[in-house]
Amino acid sequence: MRYAIYTLGCKVNQYETQAMETILTGRGHTLTEFDAEADVYIINTCSVTAVSDKKCRNMIRRTKRTHPDALIAVCGCYAQAKPEEVAGLEVDLVAGTGDRMAFLDQVEQAALDRSIPTQVSVDNALKRHDFEVLPAGGLVGRTRAMLKVEDGCGNFCTYCIIPFTRGPVRSESIDAAVTQAKALAEAGYHEIVLTGIEISSWGQDLEGDVSLIDLLEALCHAVPTLRVRLGSLEPRTITEDFCRRASALPNLCPHFHLSLQSGSDATLKRMNRKYTAERFLESCRLLRQYFDRPAITTDLICGFVGETEKEFAETLAMIEKADFSAMHIFPYSRRGGTVADRMPDQLPNAVKDARCHQAAAVAAQMEQRYLESWVGETLPVLFEEEADGLWRGHAPNYVAVYAAGADLHNVLKDVKITGLHGQALEGVIL
């Protein structure tokens, strides 16, 4: 059969999409572009916000309208959270975020027998106990591979539905992760990105006293030719022991994405975030103590429920102290089924947007300073694609770098940085 997959959402969804591509192609099926004609269209959904749900519904409806005779299968967090709503959109298969192998078996069976009525196969995510090992790799055309080492989350932030769609923390074993990483190195990748719903919790469900730094050491030693990059982390991960051991790993990329969400302790408490602004700043200080100009990036939610002018001012002051190299800034988006959605003192959208603009202005200044600090330096760059008449890639700190050259796809080169290229760097290959 010919199949196509459309992915919405986070890197974990991207990972699971490439895993499904690997499995289906390995079974003899043909992957096509989503806009092309296919027998089966799989939509891998996201449900992190109400806006995400709407995007998923729109994509399902558009696919149904454009390809009325094709089989349409929907999986992912939106399908996990609202399976009956998805089934009501007249799709053929509805599955959640678990047991991808069984889901793909159903896809194949339904493609052969279109008389089968709509199937809804969604479990209770909170009752999951085992980590589902899927093939690691990269999306077609990508130069870095993703390696999912964890699933689930037990933080229960008041604004988030994901613990209910992904279940409790489940970790991949060190041995299994090392085996997959070695296979990726042999396949020609130069970089792997460790992904998970909450990788800071990796190991808490495994036997023995193991944590994320133990996994990092094992992976970096097992594949010394691969750059190893971390996904999003919680501030609690960044301890003196973590930094001391991590800084001794030459192939660990010095890019640390620490989820902030707010710089006000009062707001953080309402969010049920389990740290203070001062603890977050301590994480930043430790990283800069042990690494040379690490990229410290973050997420920020503006206009959370009950956020006062004073609290937002505290956040602005805090992010300037943290001096992030880049920020992802979002207005708070209500999500049905969460504690925050039921809280009083919801802010108007105009206030949320205004605060986003204020925070973005501060973020732009910090990003500019960080980029300028690299002018005149040499950085190893993994090139990925042609853009703006040049080749574009990323340095270990995940800053985008542009340079001229011949075919540099999936090539690692040293680049002397000569200046800025928008919100990126530009240089010459040495």
Question: Language-model features: where?
Answer:
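Flexible glycine-/small-residue-rich
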Residues: 7, 232, 260-262, 383, ...
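Short glycine-enriched, charge-decorated loop/helix-capping segments at active-site entrances
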Residues: 47-48, 166-167, 206-209, 269-275, ...
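Conserved SAM/AdoMet-binding glycine-rich loop
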Residues: 73, 81, 186-309, 320
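Short flexible coil/turn linkers enriched for glycine and charged/polar residues
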Residues: 140-143, 153-155, 252, 262, ...
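Hydrophobic, well-ordered secondary-structure elements that form the walls
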Residues: 258, 299, 319, 327, ...
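Terminal RNA-binding accessory module
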Residues: 342-430
